[in-house]
């Protein structure tokens, strides 16, 4: 159970980190105004 709890906590932290990174990236893209820079 402890391992599952640690995996869950890591998953939440990674999710928040990726979300923050995505938000920062979208702000940078808006500042550059380059619509042809999205290949996700």
Swiss-Prot record:
InterPro entries: SMR-like. GO terms for cellular component: extracellular region. Coiled coil: none annotated. GO terms for biological process: response to toxic substance. Residues 1-20 form the signal peptide. It is found in: Secreted. May play a role in protection or detoxification. This is Submaxillary gland androgen-regulated protein 2, isoform epsilon. It comes from Mus musculus. The lineage of its organism: Eukaryota, Metazoa, Chordata, Craniata, Vertebrata.
């Amino acid at each position: 159970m402890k391992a599952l709890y640690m995996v869950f906590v890591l998953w939440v932290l990674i999710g928040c980190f990726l979300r923050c990174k995505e938000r920062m990236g979208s702000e940078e893209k808006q500042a550059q105004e380059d619509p042809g820079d999205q290949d996700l």
